[in-house]
Amino acid sequence: MTQRTLHGTVLKKVRTSGFRSRMATKAGRRVINARRRKGRAKLTV
């Protein structure tokens, strides 16, 4: 049986690339605005 190699952690994902962590920094806010301009359905994870 093959082994699953990717074990994602939801909490870690949210802390690094969630909405509130994006809004906390200037660069993160730029990311959000760029995704809004592009018309992304999902801004963050």
Swiss-Prot record:
The lineage of its organism: Eukaryota, Haptista, Haptophyta, Prymnesiophyceae, Isochrysidales. This is Large ribosomal subunit protein bL34c. It is found in: Plastid, Chloroplast. The gene is rpl34. GO terms for molecular function: structural constituent of ribosome. One of its GO terms (cellular component) is chloroplast. NCBIfam families: rpmH_bact. Keywords: Chloroplast, Plastid, Ribonucleoprotein, Ribosomal protein. Belongs to the bacterial ribosomal protein bL34 family. GO terms for biological process: translation. Signal peptide: none annotated. It holds the Pfam family Ribosomal_L34.
